[in-house]
Amino acid sequence: MSKLGVLLTICLLLFPITALPVDGDQPADRPVERMQDNISSEQHPFFEKRAARCCTYHGSCLKEKCRRKYCCGR
């Protein structure tokens, strides 16, 4: 039994139980703290503003001003 105790002690020292994530520690469970971060897509530099595209799914353009855009292949 002492070998099992030594093994358990070594395992707990190498990987303590406190290192395991608890459900309450997840950011998705704390919406109030997420809202206090105040990071939104309007202010965050990683999100760029994209202009509305007037091209259709297949790349064909129906409007004259859209034909001048790069997405139409002209």
UniProtKB/Swiss-Prot annotation:
Its main location: secreted. Disulfide bonds join C54-C66, C55-C71, C61-C72. GO terms for molecular function: acetylcholine receptor inhibitor activity; ion channel inhibitor activity; toxin activity. It comes from the Eukaryota. Keywords: Acetylcholine receptor inhibiting toxin, Amidation, Cleavage on pair of basic residues, Disulfide bond, Ion channel impairing toxin, Neurotoxin, Postsynaptic neurotoxin, Secreted, Signal, Toxin. GO terms for cellular component: extracellular region; host cell postsynaptic membrane. Residues 1-19 form the signal peptide. It is found in: Secreted. Residues 20-50 form a propeptide. Pfam families: Conotoxin (PF02950). InterPro entries: Conotoxin. The modification Cysteine amide is found at C72. Expressed by the venom duct. The keyword Cell membrane does not apply. The cysteine framework is III (CC-C-C-CC). Psi-conotoxins act on postsynaptic membranes, and act as non-competitive antagonist of nicotinic acetylcholine receptors (nAChR). Reversibly inhibits both adult- and fetal-types nAChR. The inhibition potency against the adult- (alpha-1/beta-1/epsilon/delta) is higher than against the fetal-type (alpha-1/beta-1/gamma/delta). Induces flaccid paralysis in goldfish, but does not induce any remarkable behavior in mice and does not block action potential in directly stimulated frog muscle preparations. Belongs to the conotoxin M superfamily. Negative results: does not show inhibitory effects against the mouse muscle subtype sodium channel Nav1.4/SCN4A. This is Psi-conotoxin PrIIIE. It comes from Conus parius (Cone snail).
